Amino acid sequence: MALLSIEHLSKSFTLHRVGRRIQGCDDVSFSIQPGEFVGITGRSGSGKSTILRCIWRTNLPEAGRILYDSERFGLVDLCTATQRQMLYLRAYELGYVSQFLSALPRQTAYEIVLKSALEAFGVDDRARAEAETERMLRHFDLDEELWELYPRTFSGGEKLRLNIAAAMIKRPRLLLLDEPTASLDDASKLKVRELIEQLKERLR
């Protein structure tokens, strides 16, 4: 069974100031098998981010289905899943990484990843959360001297690796990467993919 199946997905947006509708995506269908890397390509504005936001449910589609094979709920349509189901899936089964770092202004790199670890393993298992935080930071080549710094001082590549470390520490079954490497050179993009591949193999 596919991990994710998208069937005839459509989403449009209304620009109220100009009274016009624009099509985010139209009649999109594809599936993803467990363990697969799938890339969505297209020019800017073609709907790549719209599709991912529909999966993450920050955008609600107007047509189609997004069928996800959940460990807890079985086959669930993310378009009609309850808010409680979506909160659980985002916490334990789905991960989302954008090109922008989502963190409080005065959170250190270590605190950002630790927060995700505590959500995954529970506040009562802080020792495990701290150990996993250190392991994940090291895996994504974030030097120990960076751990207590604020990410606003980081390079684009360092911010991206931190973002992915925070998402991957929860060991999501499905990780959505919304153009996170857009500002990186080809060598950095390849490095990020290699790190994710290595971690995926280790967590099997």
Stretches found by the model and what they are:
Residues 56:
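Helix-to-loop junction immediately C-terminal to a conserved catalytic motif
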